[in-house]
Amino acid sequence: MNIKNILLKNVKNALKPSNLDLRNLKIKKTKFKKFGNYQIDGIFSILNKNKINLNELLNKILPIINMKLINVSEKIEFVKPGYINIFLKKSWIEDNLLKIYHSNKLGISKLKKKTIIIDYSSPNIGKEMHVGHMRSTIIGDSISLILELLGHKVIRANHIGDWGNQFGMLLAYFNEKQNLKFSEITCTDLENYYINAKKKYDKDLEFKKKSQFFTLKLQKKEKDCINIWKKITNLSIENNQKIYDQLNIKLNKTHIMGESLYNDFVPYIISDLPKKNLAINKSGNIMVILNNFKNKQGKSMGVILKKRNGTYLYSVIDIACIKYRYDFFKAQKIIYYTDSRQSQHLLQVFDIVRKAKYIPNFVKLEHHKFGMVLKKDKTPFKTRSGDTIKLSDLLKKSKEKAKKLIIKKNPNTSIDEIESLSQAIGIGSIKYFELSKNRETDYIFNWDNILSFNGNTAPYIQYAYTRVISLIKKNKLKNKNNVKFLLKKEEEIDLSICLLQFEEIINDVSKLGTPHILCNYLYDLSKTFSVFYENCSIIKTKEESVKNSRLFLSILTSRTLKVGLELLGIPMVEKM
């Protein structure tokens, strides 16, 4: 049930006989109710191009559109300087409420099925997940759920950093610390070893050479290195899975497609690109010169694939990765959720892949970049000592804060309820706060806003849901099977239109990879229901058909809030 698509299709069909170029024609929601519910956008630029004057629009074209939308719109209105406003018909709204009430998943239509790979989370092995992994993990998972709902085959790809130079450093470090017992090593230990190894790598030339030597040994899959590598990798994977489970993220071991997976395919890329005259040997380095990427001096940029010492760089692994994803999965779209600092790297990789014809032209490669998480002073979100904040510590703190809030609001809550509510509210609040922000911008992390019961927050939406559920339970329907919608008041119509707009919101989010649009919708729906609740009494209504209609609207609201939060990966609560 997509109102925008229904209106657009009808308007285009109405104008089809006129042979106009309608590619720029759009339907958008109006900002103010006095201008109707929707507007036809772009029609005036189309008419101007075809030298059609205002009189012809009013006397010929507008009546044709009106006739085509006769079952949908109450009226169509031209407003100067050049808007065509559409007022939806009440009977049409009532009929479509009935359709989505009886349909599965609120009548959301399945799209033409595509195989889409979502590359997200992708933490480095040997380090604990930190706040920097939060955006990719949470946004990528939500978009995966939404695309699955729309009927796509979604392949989740956790491109973990389980290969490369950092392992050479760790292996060299372990080689020097012969007394280490791997059975006793924790993830925290592992991260400390990496920090020590990195410091030594940056200062000690001999250790640097030793690290590069071990990186080559690992690339050659020498048994002693592979055994240690497996132990390190398994330890990190198990620790990361605990974070995913806490966050209600759908990633598991089956979704891991780390850098090591593509190691066997890299030599082919290294030999193939020079044959295609795309790569050159410059001072022993295999590299690609990209004329459409310029450095600060205006010179073409070079992307090194293999260094003279034999080690591979990330670019060649990512090239092999894209080729693999098409060859093995026949992916039609690959979406990357990484921060904006990766933009140039990914665009260069995409460029090389296209030039090498490793994927067909129809395969879409998209980088859904995101900004940084900041403190109140707009500096990177770190501890006072300047260390990155571990995600496990952040989630623990959020749960503790939620627990205190629950006890303060309702001291009589049982211990079991406090535990389940603090998990749902604490973790849900972190996720929602992240998802409610435009992913392309930086945002300030603020505990007061995250756990607030006011404004566009998880607790506000979760509480709104509990209110709706409570209302439904208190006012039992006498005839559940005789579903009928009778919209008598303006607030009922406003809520109804909001409910019918759910699918177009989901479609917009899926196209743009912007879950904050869904968060804004759920917040608006919660507010719209609150206005409806205050102005459209259910208990005091004597007319049974109107009372039932309002209860059916409440049921639809609860379903929509539930599905919406499920798509964000946020648990519902029925009591707060």
From Swiss-Prot:
Pfam families: Arg_tRNA_synt_N, DALR_1, tRNA-synt_1d
Keyword Coiled coil: no
Domain of life assignment: Bacteria
Catalytic reaction annotation: tRNA(Arg) + L-arginine + ATP = L-arginyl-tRNA(Arg) + AMP + diphosphate
EC number(s) on file: 6.1.1.19
Enzyme class: ligase
MF terms in GO: arginine-tRNA ligase activity; ATP binding
Keywords for this protein: Aminoacyl-tRNA synthetase, ATP-binding, Cytoplasm, Ligase, Nucleotide-binding, Protein biosynthesis
Ligase as UniProt keyword: yes
Short sequence motif named 'HIGH' region, residue ranges: 123-133
Residues annotated as transmembrane: none
Compartment annotation: Cytoplasm
PROSITE patterns reported in the protein's UniProt record: AA_TRNA_LIGASE_I
One of the protein's GO biological processes: arginyl-tRNA aminoacylation
Cited PANTHER family: ARGININE--TRNA LIGASE, CYTOPLASMIC, ARGINYL-TRNA SYNTHETASE
Family: Belongs to the class-I aminoacyl-tRNA synthetase family.
The name this protein goes by in its record: Arginine--tRNA ligase
Protein's organism: Wigglesworthia glossinidia brevipalpis
